[in-house]
Amino acid sequence: MRALIPRIPTGRGVAAATLATAAVSLSGCGFLMGNAFDIEVGECLASVPQDGEVFNVETIDCAETHEGEVYANVTLDDGDFPGVKKIEKTVDARCSEEFESFVGIGYNDSELEFTSLYPTEESWNTWDDRQVTCIIADPEGTTGSLKGAER
């Protein structure tokens, strides 16, 4: 399972979700249902999950309207599961650092949001999951990449 934590500037609201793995399968309208562990930098998500359990993510060609784009994958240090609070603090810092180099302006100056997928204790211990996936989001939807968007 992967946990999803939105990092949204004050006043924009906060939600949480849990992601579990799913097999890759083709769906209509250009969507590709994919494994939450396998999304790569540059892939776009039709929508960003907001809460509850999700068994797959919908990737889509970035040329089509979408809500999110993977802008970084970072690896957490090995060792015992550090706990949710420590992971969230690390994730927030690492995704914030990567945000500016991707968007072109700092997170606090941006109208865009980010969220992140990170290991749960189960995925950490069972599958040696150490990957954090940082996802930039435009809740209004966007077309094309948000790389260098400077907004």
Each PLM stretch: what is its role?
Residues 1-27:
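Sec-dependent bacterial lipoprotein signal peptides
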